[in-house]
């Protein structure tokens, strides 16, 4: 798609979604779709078999397939399919070696996607611009870059892969939605993106992961509360979820990041003292929907009460 047609695409998306969101966020969403479309094309050609071992999850999945695109999500989050078994290895050293063996071909296949879709990426694991490793190889963060058609600057897209997640629910394959559905107009301006098929987290797994994120991040991200609010409003009552299961999900995160235990203690203290809730995560610039502030505040109060109940389980 050339620059002139891309401007038409942005206008079409804004008109379709009835939003005045800034062009740069529409472009980032488009580039994520380009990356995923290229992934599917290479997958169909049988050239990236190791990427089939990744299970899609997170805010991008929620936005695209469960919540009818209420906001732009900027990242791609995955869990390795064998993460439950990797957790069973008895030593950190054995886990690290097993993860290293698995990540190498995954990185090479991400590079194939980048080369075909004209994203910048370097497979050198010492180059932190492109690859970051956290928590004894439990989590790999890959950053790929594409030149903006609007500004000419590099646009980063973060891909996070977790190798030590405890998955509690079965995962099935679904087709991932794009922000717009292919039609004659889009075809006329050169839009020809495929929709990728991934194995994905079910909604229940994402809900308990959102609870864990809220209670164990170093700092609250408003998007986690916002996502639970929208799930509760449109899909399922998140306030009725089993606290014991949520706490098991929280405990499972300590192997991924030991700091989460201290963060839980800190956040539970803030909740108890009425000081929890500060966030510098401004999601208004990413939102495509209007939110009833009264309803949102009421849900947040109910959510915080539930979080306090979960905190009592950590004593």
Regions found by a protein language model. Name each.
Residues 1-54, 64-74, 80-315:
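Structured mid-to-C-terminal alpha-helical surface segments
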Residues 56-60:
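Glycine-rich beta-strand-to-loop/alpha-helix junction loops that act as flexible
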